[in-house]
Every structure is written in structure tokens, then in C-alpha cells.
Amino acid sequence: MIGPVIKILEAPEEMPAVEALQRAVWPDSETDVVPAHVFIAAIHNGGLLLGAFVDDQLIGFVFGFPGLETTPDGPRAKHCSHMMGILPGYRNSGVGFALKRAQWQMVRHQGLDHITWTYDPLLSRNAYLNITKLGAVCNTYRRSEYGEMRDGLNAGLPSDRFLVDWWINTRRVERRLGKRARRPLKLHNFSQANLQPLYAPQAPAGSWPRPPEHFSPLEGRLALAEIPSDINALKEADFALARDWRFFSREIFETAFASGYLITDFVYDEGRSFYVLSHGESTLEQ
């Protein structure tokens, strides 16, 4: 597919299409649809709404607004990227990357250097985009961030989320978004370095992998943490097992972040998904 055309959306007559797109992306969630007047209010106060178009059809959008974060030196301005939605038929085709790259350009023009957003840690596709492709990092785990969610993609599981940091002026991010983007890491890159995963999911023949009862102590500079490769398919096949993965992964990441680790990469290879945990901040510029 030829890359989508990315446009800034700011006129009232453009908002109904964004409302309709939300209903297509998040079915059964009418009460969660962001209405036109909220988009307009945000846009008039520094917010940013970008749309992706193919043949003049809106197929995706990303929406964010200015925010403040608490630092030891006082409040600091950032951009809060709140929503991104893409029609199912256009996922895994580079639309999300194109939207985030355009957002990166626009927010830099606003004079900001930090974008944050949340996503479900168990969504491999989102992790691959956010961490591998965009170069965001994470050391914040939020339990039940949005309370009970009712839409078709999120219903049933606790709404635990990663809060990721995208330091948009760093060499790390500029390299990921450049024309010569770094090749994604593969499992053999870690096996060559004699780095083994923290745990091996139990995988009975013909069934979904199950989280182990225990995991190895976090030691050294790097660690690998495996998650299910397709949590949505797992939810449909065995919802109780999907919940087990939610609580197991919660323990893994809360333990890692409390011990000074942060997520700096993500590996999808051979049908398996792994987060790369780094101790300290030595990899932020890479």
C-alpha cells in the first residue's frame, strides 16, 4: 500500500468522520466516543488531531493535547498523546508509524521534547510500534488505569497500562524515525550474547502458553520478559488464562521497574514476543 496522506484536522465539519472512525475501531463503546466539541476545544488550546487518508477516506487518527508532569524542579510541559485508532483493514501497514511520525514533527514545532501515552503491556502489536519502531521507553506501570472498560477490545481484563516516554529530540528517536532505521532485534542477537529469558512459559502440546509460577531474579544489565504473542486471540480462546497473564506480567514489570529497570526494546521473532529490560538509562541514546 502506498503510504497514507497525513492531514491536520481542525475544522468542525471534519469532526464527524473522526467520531464515526472511533465507533468502527472500538465497537460497543458509544459512551467512550470523544465528541466533536472536545476535539475542537483541545485544538483551540494547543491540542493536535491528525488524520490518515487513503483515497480521501479517513482510515486512522491520532489525538493529543498539552499536559504537565511533576518533576523535582516543578511542573514541566509535555504532549499527552491520548488516542490513536486505525481501521482494522489498514492495521499492520505502516499507518500508525506514519501518524506518530507526523505527530513527532508537529510537537517538536511546538517547542516540546516529551510525549507520553499509555498502552496495554500485553498487546504485542502496540509494543512493536511504540518501543521498537518509535523508540519510546517505559518504567511506569499503572494498575487499572481506566477502571472497567466496556469496548470490544478491552472488556473483561483489568485496564493495566504502561505509561511510555517518548523523548523526541534524542538521537535514539531520531535514528528510529530516520530513513535508515535500525533493523529490529532478533532472538539470535540475544542468544549470541548468552542472554536468556527470565522465564519459560509452560507450553503443553496444542494449547496456549501458560505463565510459570516463578521467574528468575533480575540481575545484570539486560533481561528478557516474554508475553503472549496475541493476547486478543488468547482472550477469545481462554479468558481465564488471559487474566493469569495479566496478573503475572503485572508482577514482572512492577518488580523490574522498582529495581531500576526500564523497557528499551521489544522483540517479535519466531512467533514469540519479548520485552527487553535495561538497568539504568545507558541505552536511551541508542
Language-model regions, residue ranges each:
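Broad gene-expression machinery/nucleic-acid interaction feature
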Residues: 78, 114, 161-163
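Conserved GNAT acetyl-CoA-binding A-motif
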Residues: 107-120
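Intrinsically disordered, low-complexity, positively biased terminal segments
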Residues: 11, 110, 123, 129-132, ...
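Conserved acetyl-CoA-binding loop-helix of GNAT-fold acetyltransferases
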Residues: 86, 92-107, 126, 241, ...
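Short, glycine/acidic-rich beta->alpha junctions
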Residues: 44, 98-99, 116, 122-123
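A conserved beta-strand-loop-helix scaffold within acyl/acetyltransferase catalytic domains
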Residues: 4-88, 120, 142, 264-269, ...
